[in-house]
C-alpha cells in the first residue's frame, strides 16, 4: 500500500497575509502537518506488525494512534484547500441556497460557525459538514483531530482551532483569528465539496 504524503500547497506560505502569517503557514504545513503524516505512516507500520504478532493490546493502541494522526492529516489537507489568497466574500449557487434554507441566512450561518469555533474548549476544529443521511448542513465542534463527528458527515469547511494555527500571530485572542479566517475562505472549494457530497454519497451508508 502507498504511504501517506504531505500535500503541496496551491499558494506560497505568505500568500494569506495579513490574515494568516507566512510564518504560521510554514510551521503549520512543514512541521505540524508533516508530523501527522509521519504519525499515520508509523501507526500503519506498527499496526501491521501488531496484527502479524497477534498482539491485541498493541493493535488497539495503534488503531487509536492511527485515528488521531489520520484525522490530523485529513483535517489539514481539507484546511489548505479551504483557504485561498483570493478568498472571502460569500458562497453562491446551490450551497448558498442550502445555507439560506437551513440556517436562515449566510449571516446566521456565519454567526453559528463562529460561535462553534470561539467556544471550542481545548484543541479541535469548527466544521461545516453535509449530513449524507439527513441531506442537511450541520455545524459542529470536532474535538482534537477525530472526536465528536458522527459517521456519514462529509466535511465541507473547517477552521483549525489548535493554538499552533494562530498563536504566533493572534496570541490568546482567537476571536480575531476566526474573524480574519473569513477573509481567506475559498468558497469555490467549499462549493465543489458540497456538489460532490450531494451527488456522490446517496446510498453510500444506507442502500
Swiss-Prot record:
Transmembrane segments: none
Lineage: Bacteria, Bacillati, Actinomycetota, Actinomycetes, Mycobacteriales
Residues annotated as binding Mn(2+): 28, 76, 160, 164
GO molecular function: metal ion binding; superoxide dismutase activity
Entry EC number(s): 1.15.1.1
Function: Destroys superoxide anion radicals which are normally produced within the cells and which are toxic to biological systems.
Keywords on record: Manganese, Metal-binding, Oxidoreductase
Protein known as: Superoxide dismutase [Mn]
Name of the encoding gene: sodA
Amino acid at each position: 500500500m502507498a504511504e501517506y504524503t504531505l500535500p503541496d500547497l496551491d499558494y506560497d506560505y505568505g500568500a494569506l497575509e495579513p490574515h494568516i502569517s507566512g510564518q504560521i503557514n510554514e510551521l503549520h504545513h512543514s512541521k505540524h502537518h508533516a508530523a501527522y503524516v509521519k504519525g499515520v505512516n508509523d501507526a500503519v507500520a506498527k499496526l501491521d506488525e501488531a496484527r502479524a504478532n497477534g498482539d491485541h493490546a498493541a493493535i488497539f493502541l495503534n488503531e487509536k494512534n492511527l485515528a488521531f494522526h489520520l484525522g490530523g492529516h485529513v483535517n489539514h489537507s481539507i484546511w489548505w484547500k479551504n483557504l485561498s489568497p483570493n478568498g472571502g466574500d460569500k458562497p453562491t449557487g446551490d450551497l448558498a441556497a442550502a445555507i439560506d434554507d437551513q440556517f436562515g441566512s449566510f449571516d446566521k450561518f456565519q454567526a453559528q460557525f463562529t460561535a462553534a469555533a470561539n467556544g471550542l474548549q481545548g484543541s479541535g476544529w469548527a466544521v461545516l459538514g453535509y449530513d449524507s443521511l439527513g441531506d442537511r448542513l450541520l455545524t459542529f465542534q470536532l474535538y482534537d483531530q477525530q472526536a465528536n463527528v458522527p459517521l456519514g458527515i462529509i466535511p465541507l469547511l473547517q477552521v483549525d482551532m489548535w493554538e499552533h494555527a494562530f498563536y504566533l500571530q493572534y496570541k490568546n485572542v482567537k476571536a480575531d483569528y476566526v474573524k480574519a479566517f473569513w477573509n481567506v475562505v475559498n468558497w469555490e472549494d467549499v462549493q465543489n465539496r458540497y456538489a460532490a457530497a450531494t451527488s456522490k454519497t446517496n446510498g453510500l451508508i444506507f442502500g
